[in-house]
UniProtKB/Swiss-Prot annotation:
The gene is der. It comes from Thermotoga petrophila (strain ATCC BAA-488 / DSM 13995 / JCM 10881 / RKU-1). GTP 2 binds at residues 187-194, 234-238, 300-303. This is GTPase Der. The lineage of its organism: Bacteria, Thermotogati, Thermotogota, Thermotogae, Thermotogales. GTPase that plays an essential role in the late steps of ribosome biogenesis. One of its GO terms (biological process) is ribosome biogenesis. GO terms for molecular function: GTP binding; ribosome binding. PANTHER family: GTPASE DER. Gene3D superfamilies: 3.30.300.20, P-loop containing nucleotide triphosphate hydrolases. Residues 2-168, 181-357 form the EngA-type G domain. The keyword tRNA processing does not apply. Residues 358-439 form the KH-like domain. Associates with the 50S ribosomal subunit. GTP 1 binds at residues 8-15, 55-59, 118-121.
Length: 439
C-alpha cells in the first residue's frame, strides 16, 4: 500500500489533519507542543482508492533532549521510505527557520512533496500575507486547508491520489485481510516495550529512551514472519490511576492502551526482570485477563539480572505466585536490547493464538466431566449435567446445571482446571464460563 507521511514542525496541526483524513480520532491532539511522539498510521479510503497515512512527531530544528533527538531521527528515517510527503506549515503565522530547515532536508531527500498550509480559515489574509513567502520553500503551489474546520480537505486528498497514481502506485481498494494476528505490547513505563517492538520489527520504529513515558500514541506495524501476518502495537506505559492527572495527554494515552488491548488477539505483558513483579504489573495483567485476551508474559532485561543462570526457577515461582490468575500464559525470559529470545516470543504468540482460536468437541468435554465427577464431591445439591464450547476468542464454555446459585468461584476454578487438564491445555488463553439452568 502506498505510504503518505505528514511532517512539519510541532503544533502546526498535523494530528488534527491526520484524524480528519482517516475519519477517526486516532492521534492525540493538544495545544501542547510535541504531543505526538511515535508515528501513528491508518488507512485513508476515498471513492475506491486507498493509501496509508502516517502522522509523525513534530520535527524540532535543534532538539534539546534525548526524546526530541529520537523523534527527529525516526521522522527523518521515515521520510526516506515514504512514497509522498505532506509538508504542513502554519498558514497563519508563516514560515520559520524550522520550516526552512525541514524543507531543505526534503529537497535533498528527493521525495515527492505536497506543501500544505494549515489554519487558513481566513483565506484572503493567507493569500495576501503568507502565501507569497511559501513559494520560497521550493515546493510550488501550496494547498490551503483548515483541518479543524474541514476546509479544502477534499482537494488535498484528490491531489494526493493524483500524485500517487502518477508514480504508478496501485490505490485500488482491496478486501481487508483479517487473518493477521493482532498483538498489543503492554506494561509499565520504561520496561522495554518499544525496544521489544523494534527488535521484533528489526528496525527503529518506536521511540526508545531511558525516560519513562516516551511512547504516547499506540504505534502499529504490519509484519510478515515466516509467512504469517501480524499487526504489532506498541503502547504507552500504564501507571496507576492515582498517579495520572485527569484531562492530560497521559490520561488520553491510557484510554488508547485499553482500546489497543480490546482490539488485540494476543497481549504481550512486559515485566522488568530487575524489579520483579509490582502491584501495577498485576493490575495490567488483570486488565488483560478481564478483557478476555490471550497473553504472553516476558521478563525483559534478563541480561541485567545477576547470577541469572541459577535464577530461572526463582522467577518462575514468582510468576506463578503473583500472576496466578494468568498462570496459563507462556513465560519467556528475554533481553530486547540484545535480541535474546525474540524468536521464542513469536513462538509463544503463535501458541497463545492457536489456543485462543481452538474449539474442542462436546464429546471430549463431557467424557472428561463424567470421569472427573466420579471422584469429585460437588457442593451439596449441585449437579452438572453436561457442557459444550460455544465460542472462541476467548474459548467460552456453557455448562448446564440444576442450580446456578450454587456455582461459586471454587466450582469455576474446578471446571477450568478440568478443561485444561483433561480436554485441551489452552496455553496462553483465558477460559470463560457460562451457566444455564436445566432439569
Amino acid at each position: 500500500m502506498a505510504t503518505v507521511l505528514i511532517v512539519g514542525k510541532p503544533n502546526v496541526g498535523k494530528s488534527t489533519l491526520f484524524n480528519k483524513l482517516v475519519r477517526k480520532k486516532k492521534a492525540i491532539v493538544e495545544d501542547e507542543e510535541g504531543v505526538t511522539r511515535d508515528p501513528v498510521q491508518d488507512t485513508v479510503e476515498w471513492y475506491g482508492k486507498t493509501f496509508k497515512l502516517v502522522d509523525t512527531c513534530g520535527v524540532f530544528d535543534n532538539p534539546q533532549d534525548i526524546i526530541s533527538q529520537k523523534m527527529k531521527e525516526v521522522t527523518l528515517n521515515m521520510i526516506r521510505e515514504a512514497d509522498l510527503v505532506l509538508f504542513v506549515v502554519d498558514g497563519k503565522k508563516g514560515i520559520t527557520k524550522e520550516d526552512e530547515s525541514l524543507a531543505d532536508f526534503l529537497r535533498k531527500s528527493n521525495v515527492d512533496t505536497i506543501l500544505v498550509a494549515n489554519k487558513t480559515e481566513n483565506l484572503r489574509e493567507f493569500e495576501r500575507e503568507v502565501k507569497p513567502e511559501l513559494y520560497g520553500l521550493g515546493f510550488g503551489e501550496p494547498i490551503p486547508v483548515s483541518a479543524e474546520h474541514n476546509v479544502n480537505l477534499d482537494v488535498l486528498v484528490e491531489t494526493i491520489i493524483r500524485k500517487l497514481e502518477e508514480k504508478g502506485l496501485d490505490l485500488e481498494s482491496k478486501p481487508e485481510i483479517t487473518d493477521a494476528i493482532k498483538v498489543a505490547i503492554v506494561g509499565r513505563p520504561n520496561v522495554g516495550k518499544s525496544t521489544l517492538f523494534n527488535a521484533i520489527l528489526n528496525k527503529e520504529r518506536a521511540l526508545v529512551s531511558p525516560i519513562p513515558g516516551t511512547t504516547r500514541d499506540p504505534v502499529d506495524e504490519e509484519v510478515f514472519i515466516d509467512g504469517r501476518k501480524y499487526v504489532f502495537v506498541d503502547t504507552a506505559g500504564l501507571r496507576r490511576k492515582s498517579r495520572v492527572e485527569p484531562r492530560t495527554v497521559e490520561k488520553y494515552s491510557n484510554y488508547r492502551v485499553v482500546d489497543s488491548i480490546e482490539k488485540a488477539d494476543v497481549v504481550v505483558i512486559v515485566l522488568d526482570a530487575t524489579q520483579g513483579i509490582t502491584r501495577q504489573d498485576q493490575r495490567i495483567a488483570g486488565l488483560v485477563e478481564r478483557r478476555g485476551r490471550a497473553s504472553v508474559v516476558v521478563f525483559n532485561k534478563w541480561d541485567l539480572v545477576e547470577h541469572r543462570e541459577k535464577r530461572y526457577d526463582e522467577f518462575t515461582k514468582l510468576f506463578r505466585e503473583k500472576f496466578y490468575f494468568v498462570d496459563y500464559s507462556p513465560l519467556i525470559f528475554i533481553s530486547a536490547d540484545k535480541g535474546w529470545n525474540i524468536d521464542k516470543v513469536i513462538d509463544a504468540i503463535n501458541l497463545a493464538y492457536a489456543s485462543y482460536t481452538t474449539k474442542v468437541p462436546s464429546s471430549a468435554i463431557n467424557s472428561a466431566l463424567q470421569k472427573v465427577l466420579a471422584f469429585t464431591n460437588l457442593p451439596r445439591g449441585l449437579k452438572i449435567f453436561f457442557g459444550l464450547q460455544v465460542d472462541i476468542k476467548p474459548p467460552t464454555f456453557l455448562f448446564f446445571v440444576n442450580s446456578i446459585e450454587k456455582i461459586k468461584n471454587p466450582q469455576k476454578v474446578f471446571l477450568r482446571k478440568l478443561i485444561r487438564d483433561y480436554v485441551f491445555p489452552f496455553e496462553g488463553s483465558p477460559i470463560f464460563l457460562k451457566f444455564k439452568r436445566s432439569r
